[in-house]
Amino acid sequence: MPSVKLKENEPFDVALRRFKRSCEKAGVLAEVRRREFYEKPTSVRKRKAAAAVKRHAKKVQRENRKFQRLY
């Protein structure tokens, strides 16, 4: 869990902004949204497989862009 120590004479708004940024970096909100409802193991596998296919397609597309002729 992210924590923020208040510095001397630091406004609350600045500390709150630092806390929000640290939560964002730690992925707290994304984790909460992901765990909000139960997801069946088959759904988890299906989602992860779809993400892997998407990553692979993106990687192939990036590699093809390298070899594209620029004339």
UniProtKB/Swiss-Prot annotation:
One of its GO terms (biological process) is translation. One of its GO terms (cellular component) is ribosome. One of its GO terms (molecular function) is structural constituent of ribosome. Residues 48-59 have a biased composition (Basic residues). The keyword Ribosomal protein applies. Keywords: Ribonucleoprotein, Ribosomal protein. Residues 60-71 have a biased composition (Basic and acidic residues). The keyword Signal does not apply. Gene3D superfamilies: Ribosomal protein S8. Residues 48-71 are annotated as: Disordered. It comes from the Bacteria. Belongs to the bacterial ribosomal protein bS21 family. This is Small ribosomal subunit protein bS21. It comes from Saccharophagus degradans (strain 2-40 / ATCC 43961 / DSM 17024). The lineage of its organism: Bacteria, Pseudomonadati, Pseudomonadota, Gammaproteobacteria, Cellvibrionales. The gene is rpsU.
